A protein has these predicted regions:
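NAD(P)-cofactor binding segment of oxidoreductase domains
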Residues: 71-108, 141
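Conserved C-terminal active-site "lid" loop/helix of NAD(P)H-dependent oxidoreductases
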Residues: 230, 250-279
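Catalytic helix-loop patch of NAD(P)-dependent Rossmann-fold dehydrogenases
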Residues: 119-155, 180
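Substrate-positioning beta->alpha
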Residues: 164-171, 180-204
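Amphipathic terminal alpha-helices
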Residues: 283-308
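Conserved Rossmann-fold NAD(P)-dependent oxidoreductase catalytic core, especially the SDR/UDP-sugar
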Residues: 95-134
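Glycine/proline-rich active-site loop of Rossmann-fold NAD(P)-dependent oxidoreductases
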Residues: 140, 149-151, 161-173, 201-215, ...
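Mid/C-terminal beta-alpha module of Rossmann-like enzyme folds, strongest
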Residues: 198, 205-257, 304-308
């Protein structure tokens, strides 16, 4: 099936090579789109799947691709998160090698978590980061390391990422999802289609002289998680339990889940969409969930049935 994003994205100049360090959920989507556009793509994974062309890269275990693998790379995206170390794992292991490549654009996927809690107020790229979680502070340190690297770096700050196979649809259908109500609380999100398409758009903007150091990549509509879950139920004609008050649910949450609910912010995408001219593929969760459902149903149809 042809990639529907191909016709809305401009190809990179002839002879370009895109390297994606950490081709997981988001990185694989960019790789598949770029390949569909005829762009030469190199990817790495910590543990590549059997039969995959991805190169193994695991800095924690000193598993690094050979220098020859990076020859001629013109565009690079790192999705690799910080470990518990104080330095970025990519720059620590590949920094000198990357300096030798003809790089025109380097993207680093970070998190809007670096803004911290704004009590539901809007934040832009010009607002100073106020990270409250340790994982966000590590991200912020890596952002600065990339910006100080001397490479043509652009930081892409992402909120919650979703897409086919990673959305509330399956849990809603299975009846295992319990909505939670916390008045005034919203979450921001972005579909993987928009991560991939925005990366390509930003590569072109940079080539044309528009290269802000930090760009928020998120949809137009911050919304309560229960609203998203109700829509997922409506799309599938499934019942959804009544939302449980956050004051009751908090005691049963893991520390990680509690940390997500501890921060409330609305992230602006005005720089990306109004100033840099990007048009969202999925401007809100309704568009994104509809695409997820369509793709997940197509995948179910393609799975061969097993004879009894």
């Amino acid at each position: 099936m042809p990639d529907p994003l191909v016709n809305r994205c401009r190809p990179l100049p002839a002879g370009s090579t895109l390297c994606i360090l950490g081709a997981g959920f988001s990185g694989r989507r960019l790789a598949s789109l770029a390949e569909a556009m005829g762009i030469r793509v190199i990817t790495t994974r910590r543990k590549p799947d059997p039969g995959s062309n991805a190169l193994p890269f695991d800095s924690a275990n000193n598993l690094v691709p050979p220098a020859s693998a990076f020859e001629g790379v013109t565009h690079l995206l790192s999705t690799i998160p910080p470990g518990r170390e104080t330095s970025d794992p990519v720059l620590r292991t590949l920094g000198p090698l990357l300096q030798q490549q003809p790089l025109r654009w380097v993207g680093y996927l970070s998190t809007t978590g670096v803004y911290g809690d704004t009590d539901g107020q809007w934040v832009r790229e010009t607002d100073p980061p106020k990270a409250t979680q340790e994982r966000s502070r590590r991200r912020l340190a890596c952002e600065q390391e990339w910006l100080n690297s001397g490479l043509p770096v652009q930081i892409l700050r992402l909120p919650g990422i979703y897409g086919p196979g990673r959305s509330p649809l399956a849990a809603v259908k299975a009846g295992t999802l319990q909505p939670i109500d916390k008045p005034g609380q919203v979450f921001c999100r972005v579909h993987i289609d928009d991560i991939a398409a925005a990366c390509l758009h930003l590569m072109h903007c940079s080539a044309e002289g528009h290269h802000p150091k930090v760009v928020n990549v998120c949809d137009h509509e911050p919304a309560p998680s229960a609203l998203l879950q109700r829509h997922a139920a409506e799309l599938q004609g499934c019942p959804l339990p009544e939302a449980r008050p956050f004051s009751e649910a908090e005691a049963d949450m893991s520390p990680m889940a509690r940390s997500f609910w501890a921060e409330n912010r609305r992230v602006s995408n005005d720089l990306l969409c109004k100033e840099l001219g990007y048009t969202m593929v999925h401007p809100n969760f309704r568009s994104g969930l509809a695409q997820c459902l369509e793709q997940e149903r197509l995948r179910e149809q393609q799975v061969p049935s097993v004879a009894g």
